[in-house]
Amino acid sequence: MNFYLDVVSLTKTIFSGFVEKIRVSGSEGELGIYPGHAQLLSILKPGMVYIFHKKDKKEECIYISGGILEVQPSVVSILADVAIHAIDLDRSRILKTKKNAEESIKSNNTKINKDAILLQISKEIAKLRVLEVMDKFK
């Protein structure tokens, strides 16, 4: 048994197809969604959408910057501002962005928006976690 999943960013559809299960980071913790799951609407934190395809036993990961999860009887939709396939993430760029943001926080510059920088750091950490999971698949 499976269900239809759509993962959509502001600019394009990242994934659309039948899956056996997914795992996402909701505002209240990790959510595992299986066929026949109860209807649900949840805010998603920056992190990973883990997708499992039973047919070919394929696992796939997508980074999302946060968003909304809607679960209906036969369709699950994830709407995210930013969604990137794990294979398209650039580890060196992520580490550089994270380092620059951390240095901005340490600089004690009163003109910076520390909340925005801390959010950026958390998003970069979430991307690194997605890459760590993908490394385990290899």
Swiss-Prot record:
It comes from the Bacteria. Disulfide bonds: none annotated. It is a peripheral membrane protein. GO terms for molecular function: ATP binding; proton-transporting ATP synthase activity, rotational mechanism. The keyword Cell wall biogenesis/degradation does not apply. Coiled coil: none annotated. It holds the Pfam family ATP-synt_DE_N. It is found in: Cell membrane. Produces ATP from ADP in the presence of a proton gradient across the membrane. NCBIfam families: ATP_synt_epsi, PRK00571.1-4. F-type ATPases have 2 components, CF(1) - the catalytic core - and CF(0) - the membrane proton channel. CF(1) has five subunits: alpha(3), beta(3), gamma(1), delta(1), epsilon(1). CF(0) has three main subunits: a, b and c. This is ATP synthase epsilon chain. It comes from Buchnera aphidicola subsp. Acyrthosiphon pisum (strain APS) (Acyrthosiphon pisum symbiotic bacterium).
